[in-house]
Amino acid sequence: MAKHLFTSESVSEGHPDKIADQISDAVLDAILEQDSHARVACETYVKTGMVMVGGEITTSAWVDIEEITRKTIRDIGYTNSDMGFDADSCAILNTIGKQSPDINQGVDRTSPEEQGAGDQGLMFGYACNETEVLMPAPITYSHRLVQRQAQVRKSGELNWLRPDAKSQVTFAYENGKPVGIDAVVLSTQHSEDISQKDLIEAVMETIIKPVLPAELITSATKFFINPTGRFVIGGPMGDCGLTGRKIIVDTYGGMARHGGGAFSGKDPSKVDRSAAYAARYVAKNIVAAGLADKCELQVSYAIGIAEPTSISVETFGTSKLEESRLIELIREHFDLRPYGLIKMLDLERPIYLPTAAYGHFGREEFPWERTDKAEALRAAAGL
């Protein structure tokens, strides 16, 4: 019986890199509300008392970058200078320019269907049947822990919690299937007035136990709650934050390969984002159709060219079909040209801020999580 361990991590919305991601996507959403065809590449840097928002944006819209930034920080929970970061008093620098006309001429076309990719690159999508949302178990439960941390912090149930937090979950696998949780790490920022003993007890009872299924916990499961013993200094005061620095947290927790491109702050003409969403959509429908237990799809593009330069699929020996037949089905049922995938998933809408914390995948509210192609794929496969 083959046994192994696999670990994934997540971070909360108050982590410095996630603050940056959320500001970038809040700016994107505000622009898309007014101009659905805008070209946006918005990058954010945060540090104690300061936010710098930059990038290249071409749009007919006007948005108040400063107010969007302050509201995003406020909604996360940084509302007091005692935390080292305050939405109402931090300095905000705006260094946004326009997208290069050299890129525009490659993307924009007289015929919308021939819209070129906004850049070259390779993207991966993945799905597996380990969880009900067809995501790997380690990243799924890592996200749920920090989501629960934010929930009890914002509700006031644990009013000594602060916005910054990190989680990590190690699963034990037998023959490729998750069978239990080997280790859990949860570090959460807190106020000065809570003892380590009380913190550990409250985090275990209020955050960990309600999230992790009891049947996956054993007497051998190890728990590490604030293992340094103190986490008062956090957020941008503890570390600087930058858009696009949590790409594994954003995707599959390391279980699948990654093409290297980040998501937040990018409009859907950027295939780094939109094609990664489409690849997840394809992989999830293949698994939902029962054509494979695991599916990893790679798609690649050349700047200014509509058709993907390659499509490849890996099912790790779990497919009921030849992988060449899977690729035929993908080409028949999914339009992976930039224009096609934008229309297929209705991406020219202000839907991106919620993606910027707790993972872009495995959350049913997003259009790329639909399994509406599964039945047609199954029928076409003759299963």
Curated annotation (Swiss-Prot):
Catalytic activities: L-methionine + ATP + H2O = S-adenosyl-L-methionine + phosphate + diphosphate
Region Flexible loop, annotated ranges: 99-109
Keyword Metal-binding: yes
SUPFAM superfamilies, A to Z: S-adenosylmethionine synthetase
PROSITE patterns: ADOMET_SYNTHASE_1, ADOMET_SYNTHASE_2
EC number: 2.5.1.6
Binding-site list for K(+): 43
Function, as annotated: Catalyzes the formation of S-adenosylmethionine (AdoMet) from methionine and ATP. The overall synthetic reaction is composed of two sequential steps, AdoMet formation and the subsequent tripolyphosphate hydrolysis which occurs prior to release of AdoMet from the enzyme.
NCBIfam families found in the cross-reference section: metK
PANTHER family registered for this protein in UniProt: S-ADENOSYLMETHIONINE SYNTHETASE
Name by which UniProt lists this protein: S-adenosylmethionine synthase
Species of origin: Pseudoalteromonas translucida (strain TAC 125)
